[in-house]
Amino acid sequence: MTQVHSDVSIMPQVIISAQQLTQKIKLPQKELTIFSDLSLSILAGEQVAITGRSGSGKSTLLGILATLDQASGGELIVCGESISKLNEEQRAQVRLKHIGFVFQSFQLLPHLTAVENVMLPLRLHPSFNFAEAEQRALSLLQKVGLERQATQTPKVLSGGEQQRVAIARALIAEPKIIFADEPTGNLDSQTAREIEQLLFQLNRELGTTLILVTHDHTLAEQCQRHFELLDGQLIEHPRTGG
């Protein structure tokens, strides 16, 4: 019997495809273009950094890629779903299925314990089961090194510990993409480095795509890809790291 060998390689999945994205805002006297005709493709499992000067529009771009906001023009596909013509309710369903968020300000509910904060995204799912959600949340807290702080509220946690809770919360619904907007901006330098390494470690372990918006070029250069938003254009820097 003759064996037939396929020469077709398994190509990495394009998880985000943006074509000619444009964002404009209307001011009282004029229309301001934040950026125009931006295109990029991001593969599943990649670590991607977006940098830029303050006011360059990098957080605006993240909001569009993460389906939080709608672009003025262009085409966006996230996890195989065309976003550009969806309304807010439909975009929210895309986020619920595919996306987790880590913010600079942690955004934990102060009256809930760490484990309760981590469980929050699962409460939005129709199949929510408390016991299963709690077990998954406890497992994630262990993964981020906070199993002993599970029953503590945010006010007794350090900034780094609160961000670890936020990272666990971002992962609880098993998203395909994590968007992190200045995730270490409120932390001291040592804690910031620890959180950065945790994000990279979880990216490698779980295969989740990581998209960072940061002003820190040292952090950006640790990512597999580094884009800079400059004068309304997106420039990809050649990778220099290992």
Give residue spans per PLM region:
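ABC-family P-loop ATPase nucleotide-binding domain
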Residues: M1-K24, E236-G242
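ABC family nucleotide-binding domain
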Residues: I15-I16, L21-Q222, H226-L229
